[in-house]
């Protein structure tokens, strides 16, 4: 016999609202982080692609839940929220690594858009499933959704400064895995709770690994007609010696490859806006 769908009366509502809060938070963090990544890796005007990617993923998820998923029997809402949370945790690093491996080349932009739309699709699956299963508390769910989105819009600034664009995106996977733990507790499923905790550990390890090795570092498209790749192509021997993110851009410092007197290094903002760093002996005369 199929399992009976959990009634909102029997669900720990605080956990339910906390889960939706975290999922919505992760969605806004991801959307803003993508704008920064696309701007630095390809061109600044591709930053707005993030909005389209988010709308496609979220819109498709609503259609799927409305016309397909509701036909499933048993605790479909519980299972979908848990599996979708795991999927976000897995798919975010896969997407980053693909973009890293393909060197962010603009010819692969459609692929990057499809890959980044998948986490939004899964985020939408979670939120749509919750609204369908617990319509009686839709108002409070919506409030949790809005508060989470607001918090995400603020916290992403901190994540970008502390972990960079790639790190902030990996944080999305961590937040999603924590929501998976919450949804597993709602379902009172010990095995899935343990599995969700394993995903939390996995997400944390990826963040730490990236901080130590920059394994997910996304370069500027080497074929783009931007200041950074042009300078690297025209000056053999030059190399990026430091990369630092802030809340609105990525800064790359390049040294070597030039014999210009007094030129110590060049600084690039989002792969463009090249600026010289000139040596100075401190003598004002």
Where are the regions a protein language model picked out?
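Alpha-helical transmembrane segments of multi-pass membrane proteins
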Residues: 2-285
């Amino acid at each position: 016999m199929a399992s009976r769908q959990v009634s909102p009366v029997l669900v720990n509502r605080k956990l339910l609202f906390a889960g939706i809060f975290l999922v919505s938070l992760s969605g806004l963090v991801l959307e803003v982080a993508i704008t920064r990544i696309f701007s630095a890796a390809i061109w600044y005007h591709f930053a707005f692609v993030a909005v389209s990617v988010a709308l496609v993923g979220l819109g498709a998820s609503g259609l799927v839940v409305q016309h397909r998923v509701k036909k499933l029997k048993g605790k479909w809402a519980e299972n979908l929220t848990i599996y979708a949370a795991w999927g976000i945790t897995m798919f975010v690093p896969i997407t980053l690594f693909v973009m890293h491996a393909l060197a962010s080349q603009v010819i692969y932009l459609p692929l990057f858009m499809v890959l980044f739309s998948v986490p939004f699709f899964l985020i939408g699956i979670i939120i749509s499933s919750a609204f369908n299963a617990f319509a009686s508390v839709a108002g409070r769910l919506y409030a949790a959704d809005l508060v989470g989105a607001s918090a995400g819009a603020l916290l992403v600034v901190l994540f970008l400064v502390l972990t960079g664009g790639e790190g902030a995106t990996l944080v999305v996977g961590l937040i999603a895995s924590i929501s998976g733990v919450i949804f597993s507790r709602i379902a009172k499923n010990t095995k899935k709770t343990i599995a969700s905790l394993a995903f939390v550990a996995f997400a944390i390890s990826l963040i730490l690994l990236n901080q130590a090795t920059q394994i997910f570092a996304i370069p500027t498209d080497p074929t783009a007609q931007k200041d950074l790749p042009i300078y690297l192509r025209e000056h053999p021997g030059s190399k990026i010696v430091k990369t630092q993110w802030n809340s609105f851009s990525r800064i790359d410092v390049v040294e070597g490859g030039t014999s210009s007197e007094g030129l110590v290094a060049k600084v690039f903002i989002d792969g463009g806006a090249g600026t010289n760093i000139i040596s100075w002996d401190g003598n004002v005369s």
